[in-house]
Amino acid sequence: RFIIGGLLGFVLALTALQATLGFFAASPLRVIGGSEPEQEFLSSRLGQHAVAMQALDRLPEDSRIRFLWEPRSYYCPTGLTCEPDSLLDRWWHERRLGAGPGELVAGWGQQGVTHVLYYRLGAEAVRSAGFDPLNDDDWKELERFLTEDLVVAETFGDAYVLYRLP
């Protein structure tokens, strides 16, 4: 019992130390104290995601942005509707419903979608992981959809592309 209790205490102490070091490494107190601007803090922690979310703020109010391979929408600007791809399956789901790229543009437009935020690195991660339901035809149709059916509005590094529906 003594040994198990000692080991448990040691593990808890290491966990507390790791959490404390992580807290101070993230430096949230600088933002809370006002010595670091919030957007600068977010950019340093979230990278291109923060830049893309900030750029959405320039879109017209009431814009509806549908995300592909991006599950995070917490920093979506007020006045906009962001639809995250929570299960990273939006493209797969639409393809299984039989919608072709042209039909998607029309259908999404009828639903009020004005823009598509494509997380290129997220799609590449899913593809390289060999996500079974998506086959080569699905990926080819996605590429065609992005290049022929949508209009590039803005690019954020190699991570994100914001498209608008024509």
What are these regions (language model features)?
Residues L68, T114, Y119:
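Conserved residues at the C-terminal ends of beta-strands
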Residues R1-V31:
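Signature aromatic-anchored transmembrane alpha helix within multi-pass, membrane-resident enzymes
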Residues R164-P166:
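Active-site beta-strand termini and strand-to-loop segments that position acidic
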Residues L29, G34, L56-L59, R66-W108, ...:
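Extracytoplasmic
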Residues G157-L162:
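Short hydrophobic/aromatic beta-strand or adjacent loop that forms the aromatic wall/cage
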Residues T147-T155:
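Short secondary-structure junctions
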Residues G22-R64:
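Membrane-interface segments at or immediately adjacent to transmembrane helices
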